[in-house]
Amino acid sequence: MSDRYELFLTCPKGLEGLLAEEATALGLQETREHTSAIRGSADMETAYRLCLWSRLANRVLLVLKRFPMKDAEDLYHGVLDVEWQDHLESDGTIAVEFSGHGSGIDNTHFGALKVKDAIVDKLRTPDGERPSVDKINPDLRVHLRLDRGEAILSLDLSGHSLHQRGYRLQQGAAPLKENLAAAILIRAGWPRIAAEGGALADPMCGVGTFLVEAGMIAADIAPNIKRERWGFSAWLGHVPALWRKLHDEALARAEAGLAKTPSWIRGYEADPRLIQPGRNNIERAGLSDWIKVYQGEVATFEPRPDQNQKGLVICNPPYGERLGDEASLLYLYQNLGERLRQACLNWEAAVFTGAPDLGKRMGIRSHKQYSFWNGALPCKLLLIKVTPDQFVTGERRTPEQRQIERENPVEVEVVERKLNKNGNPIKPEPVVVEQARLSEGGQMFANRLQKNLKLMGKWVRREGIDCYRVYDADMPEYSLAIDLYHDWVHVQEYAAPKSIDPEKASARLFDALAAIPQALNIDKNRVVIKRRERQSGTKQYERQSAQGQFLEVSEGGVKLLVNLTDYLDTGLFLDHRPMRMRIQREASGKRFLNLFAYTATASVHAAKGGARSTTSVDLSRTYLDWARRNLSLNGFSDKNRLEQGDVMAWLQANRDEYDLIFIDPPTFSNSKRMEGIFDVQRDQVELIDLAMARLAPGGVLYFSNNFRKFVLDENLSQRYAVEDITAHTIDQDFARNGKIHRAWKIMARS
């Protein structure tokens, strides 16, 4: 065989340039970059060194042959011509990977079979002995890539992908591959920082991938030093003595590296379930003396190295997959920015993000950005110098002011840490951190919120209202509904029309989310966001999350439970507050019937008002359970019935009389538990006729709905005494939206 070989090194997309630099430093010559790969020439020693020391490659492929290919027969004969007896025993095992298409081969499985057949036919002995297939741990892993009519046949020297270092047997929900983590560390300057004695901290460390890769770089440990089986282990071209020499050198370097004073490397993770898996991974990597992991929230992140050294803060914040994650992610980035400004002054920071726009919300400029791919997801690496001249907070500054700051950087006094009598550091007093500056649009939005608060303040205090709407798409470009629930904020984003640029809509949403906590003086962790779109069927009642957290609020002397996270609606329709208060005033001594009861908030008000009995009918067991808790919360139980069923069918079967009836139906509903489909416009007459048949003499029925195009059937006005009371059922907080609902008072004609 030749003394020099053509090598292909594959890597994640975006790492090609870094890998080329690394491979060249390890001895690869004539290096050229390709998409997700590099190629070059090397001797066997360099090929081994690349397998052992490359922190960035996925695979090291040794090219056996290139040949032109027009069809499947060319493929078969091109592979057959290789002297496979120089590479594999006749009773060995193989696995074949095929990539590319064309030249009559559009199915990679078919292409792999042709390659396998050629190898087997070449090595089959007269007595029938032949290689077999082992896709997991073969003696030889063969790769063929078809590229524009040329077949490139290679041996995979790495075996399993080189990112599998062997230490990470436990991982979190969205792990970074080890070689991507190493690339991020290298781009962030960690090799330089580590060589200078700097520290490293990860405030969202998960199971510790950044930490372990950083430790191996700092301790000069070859990333695959613990790998026992390689793609070349059973290859007949393998040179064991040369490999042992390189491996022994790597062991000696690791021993010397670990004998040094350990770098200060710390990780913090909010999820307690990930702490032990992270520690286990660190122990498997042999770095327990170098790396420590603690449970901790981003909000309390404060790295305190033992020698007061500065260093690198590195993290990979979650990307957010569920509807409603926008708010929590925005505030996570804001918290991270605050902690960097407060606790990491003069450090460097590297934030790897799948949402670069959120990176702008940290309140610190990035001086450099790099594009990466995490699988199929495009990402950015934001590099930050945590110095005051990079902070984007407080008042706006002119370009001239910024230039003066750059020319005359602020010197930050390093305060000597005080120790207690036991020699332990005394934690300093917390520092007040400036809020991240709002964008021009965000400030305009904040001003509107504060104006609305001021306008409604006197009314809210006079009425003793705990939950109300403070904003309802007042500004067309900020199409949100914002409700205050005591000291929580519930934000509903109305889906933007398709004509609106999604990036602009997203930017405006982020502007609004940044403004809300400041304008309303609310903890940013108490803001919940949802997207409200046109609902169909039972979709409006479908669970959006499963946190199961209930908040107790008060209204008109009753206590009610709301859930801001799990469903599109919260369990309390704020626009119907005046109707519930009316029912409470009129319910004394009466039999109250609540149809389409939802969480039975109207029934609670009726019971509070002294109703003789209440009956609440709804199709959903979930909401009736919620209703039961609402009633129990106020001490009501025995005389309050909760009935699960289709309202129309229930009315047809029921023969009781009621003095006060409230109907607030959905616009449209279907369910496996009901016969047919309910449409409020179509079915209004039948519904009201059935309900009026249950109304006692002198009784009152209140009918309301939120369908904006609803028209009350004229036959009802001829049949009953009907009064439109909509104007009396809309409070000040919904006065901007007079079409939020329609309401009628219906009685039997005298």
UniProtKB/Swiss-Prot annotation:
SMART domains: THUMP. One of its GO terms (cellular component) is cytoplasm. It is found in: Cytoplasm. SUPFAM superfamilies: S-adenosyl-L-methionine-dependent methyltransferases (SSF53335). Residues 46-157 form the THUMP domain. It holds the Pfam family RlmL_1st. InterPro entries: 23SrRNA_methyltr_KL (IPR017244), DNA_methylase_N6_adenine_CS (IPR002052), RlmKL-like_Mtase (IPR000241), RlmL_1st (IPR054170), SAM-dep_methyl-trfase (IPR019614), SAM-dependent_MTases_sf (IPR029063), THUMP_dom (IPR004114). Its EC number is 2.1.1.173, 2.1.1.264. It catalyses: guanosine(2445) in 23S rRNA + S-adenosyl-L-methionine = N(2)-methylguanosine(2445) in 23S rRNA + S-adenosyl-L-homocysteine + H(+); guanosine(2069) in 23S rRNA + S-adenosyl-L-methionine = N(2)-methylguanosine(2069) in 23S rRNA + S-adenosyl-L-homocysteine + H(+). One of its GO terms (molecular function) is 23S rRNA (guanine(2445)-N(2))-methyltransferase activity. HAMAP family: 23SrRNA_methyltr_KL. Specifically methylates the guanine in position 2445 (m2G2445) and the guanine in position 2069 (m7G2069) of 23S rRNA. Belongs to the methyltransferase superfamily. RlmKL family. This is Ribosomal RNA large subunit methyltransferase K/L. It comes from Pseudomonas syringae pv. syringae (strain B728a).
